[in-house]
């Protein structure tokens, strides 16, 4: 179970967020009707509640206003969502923009895209440094036994004896499979309350059920395991 995760091991590295899956090599092109309504970049005050950061604008691509986005992992985590979403949300400092995406495609380990209102290289270069978000609802659908990392954060973890082990605080990938970072309350050497962490491999031999509706993960893991 990987960062998008299933019972099969996936490659990729990521420190947080969405999923690990190599973006499908494809072009996504706006229809004639969409192109007729290109519009422009829009400054926004309201921000989607389900916005998930999936990359950052790192450069211009070519001379016609395309931008290059580094996704949040070597394996392209965020790439499929970037290709599927027809609107991106951009943030740099206190500035927030909404961008209608007319075309997008993979380019090596990056995603390149043409946003409405960005017509030349200078305009594309002006977007360098913007973090790129897409709405969670725009993520591609997964198989029944696959999960996006962002959906696992905050879930309670219990073992098969119903002993509470903590809460998922993050996910890491060791290159073979994903690992849950599970935080739980503890007592420090000074006798003061603190937070400790256990690492549980996110693979089928240990992870028995993931119930997103109940916000609970059941694992085969003893409370005294490190």
UniProtKB/Swiss-Prot annotation:
Q: What would be one Pfam family of this protein?
A: RimM
What subcellular compartments does it reside in?
Cytoplasm
The entry's keywords: Chaperone, Cytoplasm, Ribosome biogenesis, rRNA processing
A cellular-component GO term for this protein: ribosome
Q: What would be an example GO MF term here?
A: ribosome binding
Task: Spell out the InterPro entries in the cross-references.
Answer: PRC_barrel-like_sf, PRC_RimM, RimM, RimM_N, RimM_N_sf, Transl_B-barrel_sf
Its BP terms in the Gene Ontology are: ribosomal small subunit biogenesis; rRNA processing
Superkingdom assignment: Bacteria
Q: Which residues form the PRC barrel domain?
A: 144-225
Q: PANTHER family under this entry?
A: RIBOSOME MATURATION FACTOR RIMM
What's the stated role of this polypeptide? An accessory protein needed during the final step in the assembly of 30S ribosomal subunit, possibly for assembly of the head region. Essential for efficient processing of 16S rRNA. May be needed both before and after RbfA during the maturation of 16S rRNA. It has affinity for free ribosomal 30S subunits but not for 70S ribosomes.
Q: Which family does it belong to?
A: Belongs to the RimM family.
Question: What's the domain remark here?
Answer: The PRC barrel domain binds ribosomal protein uS19.
**Subunit notes for this chain?**
Binds ribosomal protein uS19.
Name-wise, this protein is Ribosome maturation factor RimM
Species the sequence originates in: Burkholderia ambifaria (strain ATCC BAA-244 / DSM 16087 / CCUG 44356 / LMG 19182 / AMMD)
Phylogenetic classification of the source organism: Bacteria, Pseudomonadati, Pseudomonadota, Betaproteobacteria, Burkholderiales
**Gene transcribed to yield this protein:** rimM
